[in-house]
Amino acid sequence: MDRYQHLFQRLAAHNQGAFVPFVTIGDPNPQQSLRIMQTLVEAGADALELGIPFSDPLADGPTIQGAISALDSGTKPIRCFEADQAPIRAQDIPIYLLMYANLVYARGIDNFYQRCQQAGVDSVLIADVPTNESAEFGPAAKKYAIHPIFIAPPTASDETLQSVAELGSGYTYLLSRSGVTGAETKANMPVHALLERLNQFSAPPRRLGFGISEPEQVKQAIESGAAGAISGSAVVKIIEHHLAKPEAMLAELKTFVSAMKSATKHDK
């Protein structure tokens, strides 16, 4: 049983959905980054979505761009796989990477997925690679048992949703709206119609992302039929607002994640 199967079994047993925060590895610095990830897990995060620093994050809004562009913290892409940077092995929860194709190509596709396996990564979402351009990544992902994750946009055709369902595994990244990420632009609710279409194609469990910043949005996502919610910009903003007070940063992150996780409980 892999960590995805274990997670979904546990959530089903407790009548809950998943809450998944996003952070960039090495933000604001390597040492505090590890403390942040540990705090997120201790506060109740069901999984972690991790970004690898990259100078041109096309799909991310200004908040997350600020974190990903902070390469001067000393965190280079290759460092993210080194032992002292990996918060992964000790965690009994799924770890996702959200990244861009150039970082996969940089060291070779096979080598990249091998490094993911060695670091304890469960899945990879390449944000700028749609399903119809993903064929070259599939064999290496399968070889190293890394779940390929694909995005289901709200304007997708049935053909696109079918390919997302057939090629993806682990979970499906369901967009609450078009555009780039950011808590500045609220998620569009509800998403019943898109979820129903994905159900028709037996897509992997759906998690709603983009603009998720409040517990009520998480609750609405779960009530709409999503398996969980992902929040990135709201988490990154907390980090940015407490750069000079690392302990206050961790305390606010703990409060935020606890509240968001509590909102995943299904009403009986």
Curated annotation (Swiss-Prot):
GO CC field: cytosol
Reaction equations catalysed: (1S,2R)-1-C-(indol-3-yl)glycerol 3-phosphate + L-serine = D-glyceraldehyde 3-phosphate + L-tryptophan + H2O
Active-site positions on this chain: 49 (proton acceptor), 60 (proton acceptor)
UniProt xrefs under InterPro entries: Aldolase_TIM, RibuloseP-bd_barrel, Trp_synthase_alpha_AS, Trp_synthase_suA
One GO MF term attached to the UniProt entry: tryptophan synthase activity
Keywords carried by this UniProt record: Amino-acid biosynthesis, Aromatic amino acid biosynthesis, Lyase, Tryptophan biosynthesis
Similarity annotation: Belongs to the TrpA family.
NCBIfam families, per database record: trpA (TIGR00262)
PANTHER family: TRYPTOPHAN SYNTHASE ALPHA CHAIN, CHLOROPLASTIC (PTHR43406:SF1), TRYPTOPHAN SYNTHASE, ALPHA CHAIN (PTHR43406)
Name of the protein this chain belongs to: Tryptophan synthase alpha chain
Organism: Vibrio metschnikovii
Gene: trpA
